[in-house]
Structure formats: structure tokens, C-alpha cells
From Swiss-Prot:
UniProt subcellular location: Plastid, Chloroplast thylakoid membrane
NCBIfam families (UniProt xref): psbA
Gene3D superfamilies the record matches: Photosystem II protein D1-like (1.20.85.10)
Miscellaneous comment text of the record: 2 of the reaction center chlorophylls (ChlD1 and ChlD2) are entirely coordinated by water.
Site (Tyrosine radical intermediate): Y161
Identification of the protein by name: Photosystem II protein D1
Length: 353
């Protein structure tokens, strides 16, 4: 009898826990994805803060030349970064217990791998949590679909690219100047500016910003006046009211006359679908481009493609970009190799005598 009562109590406790986890009445929804999201993001954030402040230099290139990234080792907010895991580690899973000591783990850049893997798991769970809350509330799942774009972008630069290049040392450093360095080296090695998927991403981000600004300014400018001319239009509204606060017909008419009739949406759902889909699809393409360039399927190469009747090269902008790429490539990882692959000889010259 006692055992039965204990089992009922245990089941009841588990049931209450399940109800609390999945309750939409909590101030912040937790959800089953949140059970994994909370510890992973807390771990990534905590280690990032500690390492950004106090991590010792990391031997990123695996040539016994450590690079300093933390504040206590001479950096500031702009130059500081979490230095990627050493090329000596490559793609090996490198938790603390795989190193001979914590000092060795820090020297080889263990914190970078720890932060990145926990972060990617955390943001993936955040996306799942968005779907889960939408499901509980009877909503459609497109919020999580939209969030998949930045998740895909982060996964591309932190996981897919290192896998393709064979080492976590090629991942994006976690810092401001480190991000810019990653972009410059990526251009030098993969010619990303000449990749059509990157072009689609630029159109998505800049176009999304333009459309967002246009939509926000149109809505704000076409409020339905609920007040007299002598008082502010803002006085006619309450936050969260059910009634619409702007006139889409007026906005459609304004924009249709500003450009042309069919450049303007007269359906609110179509408009907002477009506002969501444009940047999301663009960022999807950029993430796909990074993931293909990770395996060295690079941007277009139009170098020396225009010649005169004598066979002399007439330089185009492609040749200017190529010269810049070579300059950037010979400058990075300056002590890891004498020449970049582009400038290395195909065959070792024979030596007589």
C-alpha cells in the first residue's frame, strides 16, 4: 500500500513538472526545448564572458605562436575576441577532460569549441521553442521558420565552414575585429564577393532594411485620426487596442501614386509575408553559399578574361579584385607558410649538380 501511494505521489510530481514546463501562463515560456536551451546558452554566455576577460593567448595556427584575445592580455573591446581552437586540434572534439591540464586546454583554444557548440545547440533549441510556443497557442509555425535564417548563418560560419576547411581554427573568431578578419580572409581565399549566393544575401539584408523602413514610415504616416486637429493623433489610441490604427487603403493609394499602382500591396497578409520572406530567403542563400565555399566551391573567376588582338590582358574589375585577394592572402597567417597556395610552384624545380 505504501509503495502504491509513493508511486502516485511521484507520478503527480512529474505531472506537475510537465504542466509547469509546458504552461503558456508562465511569464516566460520554458517548453521542452527550453529545458535544453537554458543550460546550453547559459554555459556559452558564461564561458564567453570569462574567456573574453581573462583567457590566456591561444596557439591558433599550431606553430607555437600564441595570439592574445582577452582584455587582461592587452586587448580592448574592439580588438578582443575568443580565439578559435588551435589548428593542432583540427576537428577533434576537445572537451576539458581530453587535455592533460587546464593550461593546455586554454593554450589550444578549448573555450572556443565549448562556446560555439553550446551556442549552436542553444539557438537551435530557441528556434524549436518558438515553434513549440506557437503550437501551444494554436498559431502557425512561420516565426520559427523565419528564425531559421540566422540559425543557418551561424551554423555555416561556426560549424560547416570549419568542417569543410578541416579545422576549427578556420572558424569565425568571437569578437569585432576577429569577425572582420574572418571576412577579409574569406574573400581572399574564396572570392565571396563574386558568388551569386552572397549577392542574394546582400539584396536580402539591404532590401529587407529598406522595405522595413518603408512599411514602418507608411503605417506611422497613415494613422486613422481619432482626435481633433488641435490635439495629437497619438491621444486617440490605447496600447494593445483591437481596432486597426492605420488605413491600408490610404497607404496603398499613397505608395501607388509615389511609384506605380502595382508596386503597392493592398492586402496586409501578402505585404507582411513579403516583408518576412525577402530577408529570410536572402540569408538562407548566403548560408548556403558559405556552406558550399567551405568545400572550396568558390565565387566566379573572371580573371584575365578580356584580351586584345595581340593576346595582351585588358584588366577588368575582376582583375583588380583578384590582385586585392592575393594581397590579403599573403598577409594573413604570415608565419604559418611562406607562400599562399595560389603563388606556390606546381612542381619542385630540379637542381643540377
Amino acid at each position: 500500500m505504501t509503495a502504491i501511494l509513493e508511486r502516485r505521489e511521484s507520478t503527480s510530481l512529474w505531472g506537475r513538472f510537465c504542466n509547469w514546463i509546458t504552461s503558456t501562463e508562465n511569464r516566460l515560456y520554458i517548453g521542452w526545448f527550453g529545458v535544453l536551451m537554458i543550460p546550453t546558452l547559459l554555459t556559452a554566455t558564461s564561458v564567453f564572458i570569462i574567456a573574453f576577460i581573462a583567457a590566456p593567448p591561444v596557439d591558433i595556427d599550431g606553430i607555437r605562436e600564441p595570439v592574445s584575445g582577452s582584455l587582461l592580455y592587452g586587448n580592448n573591446i574592439i580588438s578582443g575576441a575568443i580565439i578559435p581552437t588551435s589548428a593542432a586540434i583540427g576537428l577533434h572534439f576537445y572537451p576539458i577532460w581530453e587535455a592533460a591540464s587546464v593550461d593546455e586546454w586554454l593554450y589550444n583554444g578549448g573555450p572556443y569549441e565549448l562556446i560555439v557548440l553550446h551556442f549552436l545547440l542553444g539557438v537551435a533549441c530557441y528556434m524549436g521553442r518558438e515553434w513549440e510556443l506557437s503550437f501551444r497557442l494554436g498559431m502557425r509555425p512561420w516565426i520559427a521558420v523565419a528564425y531559421s535564417a540566422p540559425v543557418a548563418a551561424a551554423t555555416a560560419v561556426f560549424l560547416i565552414y570549419p568542417i569543410g576547411q578541416g579545422s576549427f581554427s578556420d572558424g569565425m573568431p568571437l569578437g569585432i575585429s576577429g569577425t572582420f578578419n574572418f571576412m577579409i580572409v574569406f574573400q581572399a581565399e574564396h572570392n565571396i564577393l563574386m558568388h551569386p549566393f552572397h549577392m542574394l544575401g546582400v539584396a536580402g539584408v539591404f532590401g529587407g532594411s529598406l522595405f522595413s523602413a518603408m512599411h514602418g514610415s507608411l503605417v506611422t504616416s497613415s494613422l486613422i485620426r481619432e482626435t481633433t486637429e488641435n490635439e495629437s493623433a497619438n491621444e486617440g489610441y490605447k496600447f494593445g487596442q483591437e481596432e486597426e490604427t492605420y488605413n491600408i487603403v490610404a497607404a496603398h493609394g499613397y505608395f501607388g501614386r509615389l511609384i506605380f499602382q502595382y508596386a503597392s500591396f493592398n492586402n496586409s497578409r501578402s505585404l507582411h509575408f513579403f516583408l518576412a520572406a525577402w530577408p529570410v530567403v536572402g540569408i538562407w542563400f548566403t548560408a548556403l553559399g558559405i556552406s558550399t565555399m567551405a568545400f572550396n566551391l568558390n565565387g566566379f573567376n573572371f580573371n584575365q578574361s578580356v584580351v586584345d588582338s595581340q593576346g595582351r590582358v585588358i584588366n577588368t574589375w575582376a582583375d583588380i579584385i583578384n590582385r586585392a585577394n592575393l594581397g590579403m592572402e599573403v598577409m594573413h597567417e604570415r608565419n604559418a607558410h611562406n607562400f599562399p597556395l595560389d603563388l606556390a610552384a606546381l612542381e619542385v624545380p630540379s637542381i643540377n649538380g
